[in-house]
Amino acid sequence: MTENIHKHRILILDFGSQYTQLVARRVRELGVYCELWAWDVTEAQIRDFNPSGIILSGGPESTTEENSPRAPQYVFEAGVPVFGVCYGMQTMAMQLGGHVEGSNEREFGYAQVEVLTDSALVRGIEDSLTADGKPLLDVWMSHGDKVTAIPSDFVTVASTESCPFAIMANEEKRFYGVQFHPEVTHTRQGMRMLERFVRDICQCEALWTPAKIIDDAVARIREQVGDDKVILGLSGGVDSSVTAMLLHCAIGKNLTCVFVDNGLLRLNEAEQVMDMFGDHFGLNIVHVPAEERFLSALAGENDPEAKRKIIGRVFVEVFDEEALKLEDVKWLAQGTIYPDVIESAASATGKAHVIKSHHNVGGLPKEMKMGLVEPLKELFKDEVRKIGLELGLPYDMLYRHPFPGPGLGVRVLGEVKKEYCDLLRRADAIFIEELRKADLYDKVSQAFTVFLPVRSVGVMGDGRKYDWVVSLRAVETIDFMTAHWAHLPYDFLGRVSNRIINEVNGISRVVYDISGKPPATIEWE
């Protein structure tokens, strides 16, 4: 019998902050399971979840507006600790009898909070001291409204010059509100405050660890599928690879992985996937060489969105054909992860539907009545990677840069041809190899090469040549929502350019993309 790793759990109610998923990831990093729900859940749903504590997230709305989001009143009647962050603090104050006002000045950026009163939330936590020995905390503020009167049974724990109630608390009820964001790294002691709330005040044990998550997933897979057969589309990406390893641990040869080689992968990627999962780990893999089929379906198509749809459609066709060849397969496994199933908290109806359906493989034939196995659906991407390491997958594979689902289909601009893909594969491999050699690979968030369907004159020896152009792209980003182009050293870029032009026959010019996001996107298509 495996340990119940969901025994202690935190419920996070999402009021729409850009940082809400970060709050959840921080709680998980503390070894405690949590779920992220839209703010307008019912009392029955909260009772059913039975949380050890509740966190109210930040959000873009103003509590002073008439129909702004509110926490269900039951949150404050459930008898568990509650932690309000930014908007979460404001709605807590309003709902419990305090007062919030719009402020003429937005407080955005660093602030120093002075701790005035002892509180379980911040006891012994400080960044520096005032002249008279009071603790100071360096925090990150991002708010317009502010609490102007706290509920009568609360005390002021900390303040700033422009924010009289930066932290408020009701120690008896274990209700806490902070006007700053403890989940962001700019709040230097934020993780310690979250740990204090989750581990000490809510008394949650650290049961949510990679080894225990694996044991739990394996037990749940066995319970769900029994002796039935399972099929999985293995791409070699992080999610499908970790899904494959978990299923292999749970059911061994009853798992069949289908690896569709679409001709749009990186250099030697198909061989690497087969070597690692087939030869090294001993998984049962069907290798389907389908390059010709994908390229002929893409012939003559220039539109990026149409190319994506074609690649998706052909993948489903090929996968379905392979699935139908297998006898007695009852289950389809997918690498769905937690962000895929979190619905935005901004529910237009005012009622939340927390889970949305998400299908990586798309429409399976009607005659294939299969159940769905999704062993990663509670996990964030960083947790999936940690589990992959625990399962023995190589670090370089788990932590490599993102690669788009359609592969080189959207990195060859315009029409996709085998000649273009072959040139691009080799040029891209040189760029990545040089980044690793120069110890720059992990310093950029994503790097790749793009094939441009334009010819350019070049000189080789005594002759002129008229060949293709590629662009190098490297960006630095935290969340991939915005990104800066990476300022790679000129001598490094020169070395990469020389190698590509000299070693890849058919490329005569290399350019470097210096566009940020926005206005450009990270991928060209």
From Swiss-Prot:
Q: Catalytic residues per the record?
A: C86, H181, E183
A GO MF label: ATP binding
Enzyme class, top EC level, equals: ligase
Concerning Gene3D superfamilies, the annotation shows: 3.30.300.10, 3.40.50.880, HUPs (3.40.50.620)
Which parts of the sequence belong to the GMPS ATP-PPase domain? Answer: 208-400
| InterPro entries listed in its UniProt record | Class_I_gatase-like (IPR029062), GATASE (IPR017926), GMP_synth_C (IPR001674), GMP_synth_GATase (IPR004739), GMP_synthase (IPR022955), GMPS_ATP_PPase_dom (IPR025777), NAD/GMP_synthase (IPR022310), Rossmann-like_a/b/a_fold (IPR014729)
Residues that, per the record, bind ATP = S235, G236, G237, V238, D239, S240, S241
- Kindly state which keywords UniProt assigns to this record, in alphabetical order: ATP-binding, Glutamine amidotransferase, GMP biosynthesis, Ligase, Nucleotide-binding, Purine biosynthesis
Family annotation (SUPFAM superfamilies): Adenine nucleotide alpha hydrolases-like, Class I glutamine amidotransferase-like, GMP synthetase C-terminal dimerisation domain
Q: Which reaction does it catalyse?
A: XMP + L-glutamine + ATP + H2O = GMP + L-glutamate + AMP + diphosphate + 2 H(+)
Record pathway: Purine metabolism; GMP biosynthesis; GMP from XMP (L-Gln route): step 1/1
Q: What Pfam families does the record tag this protein with?
A: GATase, GMP_synt_C, NAD_synthase
Q: Could you tell me which residue ranges the Glutamine amidotransferase type-1 domain spans?
A: 9-207
SS bond list: none
Task: Give the enzyme's EC designation.
Answer: 6.3.5.2
Superkingdom of the organism of origin? Bacteria
GO cellular-component terms in the record? cytosol
- How is this protein organized at the quaternary level? Homodimer.
Protein's job: Catalyzes the synthesis of GMP from XMP.
NCBIfam families reported for this sequence? guaA_Cterm, guaA_Nterm, PRK00074.1
Q: What is this protein called?
A: GMP synthase [glutamine-hydrolyzing]
Q: Which organism is it from?
A: Salmonella schwarzengrund (strain CVM19633)
